[in-house]
Amino acid sequence: MDQAKQDELKKAAAKKAAALVEDGMVLGVGTGSTVKFFIDELGKKKAAGLTLKAVVTTSSRSQKQLEGYGFTVSPLSEVDQVDLTVDGADRVDKQLNGIKGGGAALTLEKNVAVNSKKNVWIVDESKVVDHLSGFALPVEVLPISCMQVEKRLADEGLKPEFRLTEDGQRLKTHYGNYILDLKLDRIPVPSGLADYLDHTVGVVEHGLFLNICDQVIIARDNGEIEVRSR
């Protein structure tokens, strides 16, 4: 499929997600190529009179785009709860569980998501899988114990690798931590791995988003827009 056709599908999915946004909401906005089109749709709705109580976002790129449309972006700490968050995902399975954090913003993404009444992901068909696989699982770790965590994960057969910058340095997250990418072919029991990582000292957060997403809007290659709900 050529890029122009793929973009048209993403725009259609973004428009469907934008239809869920209502006046007076506290809205969470993620990042990614499809979310970019969602923000464009928000801009149209704002021009038509949409008013939001607050907007929070998970990336500086989305913040800049939102502000370009006249939205004021607030930090998560300044809102009690988010009514709706629209974001992308790196992978999503049949149970609407997903892998996120390819952009290294997993800690903020998960904090926004778990503090949202409803989470909607918009993705293209390439992100949809039967079982979580085909994408490295990011794990954010504290620098002070990163080597110990790496060894512990390696001993468990989880194949950790430090994510590096273009010049070969360890990539630092917004919070000054490192990312270990788990190069797993497949995650057979996501809940078990999530529980293990949750209880590993030195792990700040991981990219398994389980029982968080309420609805996925999928741009299919055949031109259809599919909606799956939990």
UniProtKB/Swiss-Prot annotation:
Stored Gene3D superfamilies: 3.30.70.260, 3.40.50.1360
Record-linked Pfam families: Rib_5-P_isom_A (PF06026)
Molecular functions per Gene Ontology: ribose-5-phosphate isomerase activity
One of the GO biological process terms: pentose-phosphate shunt, non-oxidative branch
Alphabetical UniProt keywords: Isomerase
GO CC, one annotated term: cytosol
Signal peptide: none
Record-listed substrate binding positions: T31, G32, S33, T34, D87, G88, A89, D90, K100, G101, G102, G103, K127
EC main group: isomerase
InterPro entries: NagB/RpiA_transferase-like (IPR037171), Ribose5P_isomerase_typA_subgr (IPR020672), Ribose5P_isomerase_type_A (IPR004788)
Reactions mediated catalytically: aldehydo-D-ribose 5-phosphate = D-ribulose 5-phosphate
EC number: 5.3.1.6
Family per record: Belongs to the ribose 5-phosphate isomerase family.
NCBIfam families the record matches: PRK00702.1, rpiA
PANTHER family, alphabetized: RIBOSE-5-PHOSPHATE ISOMERASE (PTHR11934:SF0)
Stated role: Catalyzes the reversible conversion of ribose-5-phosphate to ribulose 5-phosphate.
Protein name: Ribose-5-phosphate isomerase A
Native source organism of the sequence: Lactobacillus delbrueckii subsp. bulgaricus (strain ATCC 11842 / DSM 20081 / BCRC 10696 / JCM 1002 / NBRC 13953 / NCIMB 11778 / NCTC 12712 / WDCM 00102 / Lb 14)
Taxon lineage: Bacteria, Bacillati, Bacillota, Bacilli, Lactobacillales
